[in-house]
Amino acid sequence: MNKFALICLVAFAAPGVATAADTTPPAAAQKAVLVTGASSGIGRKVTERLATEGYFVYAAARKEEDLRALDAIENVDSIRLDVTRPEEIAAAVEFVRKAGRGLHGLVNNAGVAVVGPLTETKEEDLRFVFDVNVFGPYRVTKAFAPLILESGGRITTISSIAGILSRPPLGAYSMSKHAVEAFGDTLAAELEPKGVKVSLIEPGNYRSEISRNASVRMGLGPDSPMADRSRFPEPDDVATAVVHALFDANPKRRYMVVPERREAELTIGKAIEELVQLNERQPYSYDRDELVKMLDAALGRSQ
């Protein structure tokens, strides 16, 4: 099946007998979402969840076999899209525009990693990570922004708790996700006054192919211990957070989605530690009561 082909499903049913097709919204009403990096891991899980719930998904991937697999899912059209290739991004925009469904949501999910000490990381590997993880969302968001603004829709970017934590040997990946955090915050400040809600999803340790792909790139092979993430749970909770960010009337700016309390404790603890460092022996510092007052005010705004 051509990767850009629309899948037309025609159901014949006796009067008064409901079928699965009856639950799918008509094209004009069926909200559409573009998901990058949809071939596996979080992207695949998000694609399947959205399609199952009756939304239409433009599922972006690079490899022909992945495109065919995505096309086999009801309510999904695959799009060949490498987020590092502007010409493929432009072609994807044109395809979505011509399809006539509009675009309610964008999920920037495509991501890569490399491992190793920063002082030993090759510049080309660092550029590779930033090209996909930082410039990728920037390119795709910039290209699809007119369609999202037109629909008053949502932009959701998959960040990571690594965008808050900074731990070896994932320094390059963590650098890129810190940049994604700034990207999301700035985008929200720019677009929310125009009616577009922006969210960041910060997953912890879930099952995905990112470690395997990183292991292969670093010459460690697909079967190295570092590549094995089978001990981690499937990212169902991450998909739930994405759906909430895309369609809830009151989406959150940030969704920290972790499989265990320890990861949450480490992440929140790191944010608090940075707060203490910012306040410690500085030209303008605040005592405990003043900090608690600031915290209470922030908690009040989040209600």
Give a label for each model feature.
Residues 39-40:
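Conserved glycine-rich cofactor-binding loop
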Residues 141, 176:
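Active-site helix of classical SDR
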Residues 121, 166-174, 186:
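Active-site loop-to-helix junction immediately N-terminal to the catalytic Tyr of the SDR YXXXK motif
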Residues 193-256:
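SDR active-site lid
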Residues 117-118, 125-127:
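Substrate-binding pocket helix/loop in short-chain dehydrogenase/reductase
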Residues 160:
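Residue(s) in the substrate-gating loop at a strand-loop-helix junction
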Residues 81-91, 123:
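The beta1-alpha1 cofactor-binding region of Rossmann-like NAD(H)/NADP(H)-dependent oxidoreductases
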